[in-house]
């Protein structure tokens, strides 16, 4: 019997749990399904399989659940240093919050006005077209330098459907943004400036198809926001920053355009894990996976062994490539696991003790071409006193800062801000820091695909490897953010139920 999603969710059918295990794992702890990775995808897969009567064990190397969902408790309150935003279109995440009794609030992270600092000078975006530094050509000249990468990437996006990025009809676009802009005849300066706001790892390192997948999915959230927007709400056309979505706080069905979980986003994986109980095993780092046609075995660094009729691997490929996998040859999966790059985001979360921008007269927030990347000043809705702020590093700057330890990174960023904005001296108090590339159990904030990799393996890399199925945001097909993790969990669980029916 084949179960589609609707049939599975409505059937309530209990799948028999008396499933054999491979002879090689008879001494191991046995389960119907062993899941590696207790992030959202692993937890949701486990929930779905347990609901259908299967015996599940869920392993994670960390001492906490959640993966890249992480809330840090600070003197200023909880701060989400990983996933945090729940959009109106996040159907699966919204359903999970409702099932676990979690409340949502409109995200309070409106960014104050941006200025740009390029080539040693402050740039007024409104007058950029007439600036002597502007060596762009034609319509390029109208785009502020901190927006040109995302603007030009979106301009040439022909994709309409959520899964078009995987359609071979668009295989010619499995190239870098630099190659695309060169083919389209853009000026050298436009291409150089595009590097500072290019989505993904960078203008050379990320396939345009990977960039466009996010852009197409983002359109859905923006259209939902625009449909509900008040006349004064910020629209995409008015944005003065390339990264960080603008929130329309108007409540539609109890939801703003962007929402946060009360108490921090970690409340969701914690609630999911609590329901699963002792099926979740922390401190279990997989070092070996042995596959056959009848079962699989996971060996952990502490010597413990777990065997299952099926496995689900949800850990990022940046970590899976360190696990010894034995089984039938699978060149597509091997290539994906070995070579898939991971982007980085590094953020320094701070309190701005006084609004120093009132002293120097410059815009509160900054996009720069220097090592600081961006500084986001967050509206406190009064304009006076302390404000929250963030140093946000993506692309080149994020890769560069990852060679520094926390103390050196903090000193670099605060020092660079003071160099550009002397009025900021003494006004910055650090709350917390997160560099995902330096996280030893993640090694990046999200998957990427290099030019050529969509054609090489992205379409087929999610297919099961004998009894091992793949989930995690890196296996997304149509979604992004936390919703992509839940999407992949749903797919992997249904794949296994189809094989056991």
How would you label these PLM feature ranges?
Residues 2-501:
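FAD-dinucleotide binding site
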